[in-house]
Curated annotation (Swiss-Prot):
ATP binds at S58, G59, K60, T61, V62, Y184, R196. The gene is cdc6. Belongs to the CDC6/cdc18 family. Gene3D superfamilies: 1.10.8.60, P-loop containing nucleotide triphosphate hydrolases, Winged helix-like DNA-binding domain superfamily/Winged helix DNA-binding domain. Keywords: ATP-binding, DNA replication, Nucleotide-binding, Plasmid. GO terms for molecular function: ATP binding; ATP hydrolysis activity. It comes from Methanothermobacter thermautotrophicus (Methanobacterium thermoformicicum). This is ORC1-type DNA replication protein. PANTHER family: CELL DIVISION CONTROL PROTEIN 6-RELATED (PTHR10763), ORC1-TYPE DNA REPLICATION PROTEIN (PTHR10763:SF22).
């Protein structure tokens, strides 16, 4: 069974978006900016809050982790916590405090974070900070941004993430330095892939046009390095499945469909059931106003899924969350001079609707 399996990989894990390389290509300016601010901790000072924004796959997470890894080589006094902040304020707080998720109130959890911060200066990296802000994350930022020993580093795909903060008290205390990441260009993506290829693959197993093609296709997807890495990884999987000793251009083109399916699977996996049903309502109605979606959601919930109806306010919040995940698009349509605007919700134009509907059906 395994004897005939081609040995293409030296280390497949290198192609994972979770892998943090020893050096970074084409992000020297951003590395310099982040390290300049966080470096104040080496002088005994609390670094200023940071907000790092840019499109998906632009290197925000890997660059921040790289700087953090380097910082930890120079200090043992700092308390550094990295979390994906995609839950409620309470859930995010328990992750930061490393506390159990039951039995303690929110303010008790905040007090435990204060205790951790009292051990030294504390840097809290909150990846996908927009996700918790779309829920009740203001509440947590209110407390953390007022702690003299705490530096918050927020990462977001949403350029207007600060507009999500509705509490004026938070706005006055959380005034981050902003660092923006531009999408990668095709040459930059090619450089990133070539660096990883040396560590990931055995010699001579990629045809010459494989890396340039992956880079070009990813550049068309808003310069998404994760997409480029997924394409290369999936193309190699296809070659192995077909018992080929070399990855070809045709494998890359076949991989585009598999990467799309995997993206949809991951997207659905992170949703709660009410979000899945709401997305299903948007997809099957081909869009509509929030009121129209609201009626369809409640009808579907009662007739097909046996769940509970939502208030229109809660549904609007869920629609905003789906927009943050890149699964729906919310268009603002004018009603004429002096008559205000309407929302119009449509499925994301970048996602295959049939694949998405099938994935939702399987998950419910």
């Amino acid at each position: 069974m395994f004897e005939k399996r081609p040995r293409l990989f030296k280390n497949r894990d290198v192609l994972s978006p979770l892998f943090v390389p020893d050096t970074l290509q084409d992000r020297k300016e951003e590395v310099g900016a982040i390290s300049q601010y966080l470096g104040y901790i080496l002088d005994g000072a609390t670094p200023p809050h940071l907000l790092i924004v840019g499109p998906p796959g632009s290197g925000k997470t890997v660059t921040t982790k790289y700087v953090i890894n380097e910082l930890e080589k120079h200090t043992s006094d700092a308390v550094i916590e990295y979390i994906v902040a995609d839950g409620t304020a309470y859930q995010v707080a328990t992750s930061i405090a490393r506390a159990p998720r039951r039995g303690l109130g929110f303010l008790n959890i905040v007090e435990k974070i204060r205790e951790r911060a009292s051990e030294g200066k504390m840097i809290i990296v909150m990846d996908e900070i927009d996700k918790t802000l779309s829920r009740d994350g203001d509440k947590l930022l209110y407390h953390l941004s007022r702690e003299p020993n705490v530096c918050i580093v927020g990462l977001s795909n949403k350029l207007t993430v600060m507009d999500m903060i509705g509490d004026s008290g938070v706005i006055s205390s959380f005034k981050p330095r902003r660092i923006s990441f531009a999408p990668y260009s095709a040459p930059q993506l090619e450089e990133i892939l070539n660096y990883r290829v040396e560590m990931a693959f055995n010699d001579g197993v990629l045809e010459d046009d494989v890396v340039p093609l992956c880079a070009a296709l990813a550049a068309q997807r808003n310069g998404d390095a994760r997409y480029a890495l997924d394409l290369l990884s999936f193309a190699a999987d296809i070659a192995i499945r077909q018992l080929k000793g070399v990855v070809s251009e045709s494998d890359v083109r076949m991989a585009t469909d598999e990467v799309e399916v995997e993206f949809i699977r991951r997207s659905i996996e992170q949703l709660r059931d009410n979000q899945k049903i709401l997305l299903y309502a948007v997809m099957t109605s081909h869009g509509g106003t929030p009121t129209e979606i609201y009626r369809k959601y409640n009808k579907m919930t009662e007739e097909q899924f046996g769940g509970n109806a939502l208030t229109q306010r809660r549904l609007s919040q869920l629609l905003r969350e789906l927009e943050l995940y890149g699964l729906v698009e919310i268009e603002v349509v004018g009603r004429g001079r002096g008559r205000g605007v309407n929302w119009h919700v449509v499925p994301s134009s970048s996602i295959d609707p049939e694949l998405m509907l099938e994935a939702i059906r399987r998950s419910l």
